[in-house]
Amino acid sequence: MPGNHDIPYTFPARFTRPWAEFERHWGTTQPLHAGDGVVVVGLNSVRPWRHQSGKVTSQQLAAVTEHFHRAPPHALRVAVLHHHMLGAPWRSKKKPVKDRNAVLASLVASGAQLVLAGHIHQSTIAERREFEIATPGGERAVIVSIAPALGRPRPNRHGETRGLHVYDAAENELTVRTYMWREDGWGLIAVRRFPLGVEPLAFEQRERAGTAS
């Protein structure tokens, strides 16, 4: 997927041929992969006139819906874009993709189960219901994952490191393993498990004070 550093800095190429070099290497800015048990739809969120901010159009979201609706019922549905849907609290100045709430709501409605992004160079993973108010039909699990940067950390950027996520999808569960680069190789630093599919919200039943046992 193209990021904001994958387009020319020079004028007029930035506006007249922004994707030429990227497409020369990768063929398209909005890839689609339909494999055995998984459908991955890429969304180009980069806008040449804004270096940092990202945007997804209604036409792009409609295409995601079409691809997911054509996918087999059992397939894991994954949407990928560069700009993040949520950010680490310590990177609060990095704004998420424009109209984040509407974009995420559209992806959820289309059937997305996993939404992947990057941009902020730091790892964050959450289940959608952790930061959005539950609505009718909101019992379906959707995981939002922001991948760490794979390349060398930028100078004078504290808290950044090389890292990657590995996703392992089972029938009712998604396992996310986070690896960080150490001097002697990759080290596993976290394993997180999230529900897949429809799972009603669970509330703990607490005994009232003074209730006889």
Describe each region flagged by the PLM:
Residues 1-66, 71, 105-108, 132-133, ...:
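Extended active-site neighborhood of metal-dependent phosphoesterases/phosphodiesterases
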Residues 168-213:
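A short C-terminal boundary segment appended to hydrolase-like catalytic domains
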Residues 37-47, 78-82, 142-149:
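Active-site-proximal beta-strand elements of phosphoester/diester hydrolases
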Residues 72-88:
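Short acidic, glycine-rich surface-loop motifs adjacent to enzyme active sites
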Residues 11-13, 51-56, 90-95, 155-158:
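Short, solvent-exposed loop/turn segments at secondary-structure boundaries
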Residues 4-6, 45-46, 83-84, 118-120, ...:
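Active-site metal-binding loops of divalent metal-dependent hydrolases
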Residues 93-170:
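Conserved beta-sheet core of the metallophosphoesterase superfamily
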Residues 73-76, 112, 173:
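A general structural motif
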